[in-house]
């Protein structure tokens, strides 16, 4: 618990620093961009499902998740129009938990807030890029016949690869793959009895439009 608080505080500080850097004026000429993205979230089953609270020590089978639409946006900067940049990436998806035998499915939504370092090839028309960094994942579990509504915030990581194609000097189309890994901790999923922890991993495919200035 202490380690989790420490990591969360460090990550929050890093995200805040990223936002402040993105929003502060810089004496160095930089290339800024904003982007909108739309795609699909292909989540692996929730694995390593373990009880928490009074249910600690109990294991459960994997929870299969549905494929869902995903959407979001980006705000980023390449200082000095160089190879390296940073970006704030926010995306949202709804990988609901599928039916568990005779138990109905459970609504699940996930908001991914990532602070990424990006390395690109700064071509005039084509710009392939890779990146990654820490993320905060805000997941909300819906109320069902077996669960209570619960929200958790966990630390995770994103890795991404994509390619951008400029259709004008300032407007580009892009496609991107992003992989996310985290551990969800729904401590109140079963009310006062306890909850569960599980490993969350997802693959996302996006297409988007970015404006550079």
Annotate each language-model stretch with its function.
Residues 1-31:
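Cleavable N-terminal export/targeting peptides
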Residues 26-82, 204-213:
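Short glycine/proline- and aromatic-enriched beta-strand/turn motifs that initiate or cap beta-hairpins
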Residues 30, 67, 109-111, 153-155, ...:
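Residue-level preference for beta-strand/loop junctions
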Residues 32, 82-86, 125-126, 165-173:
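Repeated loop/turn-to-beta-strand initiation elements of outer-membrane beta-barrel proteins
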Residues 42, 71-146, 181, 200-213:
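Gram-negative (and chloroplast) outer-membrane scaffold detector with strong preference
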Residues 46-55, 97-104, 140-148, 185-193:
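Outer-membrane beta-barrel translocator domains and adjoining extracellular loop/strand segments
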Residues 47, 59-61, 168-213:
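Predominantly the C-terminal beta-signal and adjacent terminal strand-loop region
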Residues 59-63, 103-105, 120, 145-151, ...:
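Outer-membrane beta-barrel proteins
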């Amino acid at each position: 618990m202490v380690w989790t608080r420490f990591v969360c505080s460090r990550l929050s500080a890093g995200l805040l620093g990223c936002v402040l850097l993105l929003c502060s004026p810089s004496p160095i000429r930089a290339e800024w961009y904003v982007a909108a993205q739309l795609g699909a979230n292909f989540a692996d089953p929730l694995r390593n499902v373990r009880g928490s609270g009074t249910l600690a020590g109990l294991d459960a089978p994997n929870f299969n998740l549905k494929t869902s639409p995903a959407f979001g946006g980006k705000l980023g900067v390449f200082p000095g129009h160089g190879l390296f940049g940073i970006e704030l990436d926010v995306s949202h998806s709804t990988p609901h938990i599928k039916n568990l035998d005779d138990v109905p499915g459970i609504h699940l939504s996930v908001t991914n807030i990532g602070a990424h370092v990006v390395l690109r090839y700064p071509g005039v028309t084509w710009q392939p890029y890779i990146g990654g960094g820490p993320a905060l994942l805000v997941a909300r579990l819906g109320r069902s016949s077996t669960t209570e509504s619960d929200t958790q915030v966990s630390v995770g990581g994103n890795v991404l690869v994509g390619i951008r194609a400029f259709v004008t000097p300032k407007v580009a189309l892009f496609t991107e793959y992003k992989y996310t890994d985290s551990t969800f901790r729904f401590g109140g999923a079963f009310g006062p009895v306890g909850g569960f922890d599980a490993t969350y991993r997802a693959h996302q495919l996006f297409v988007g439009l970015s404006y550079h200035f």
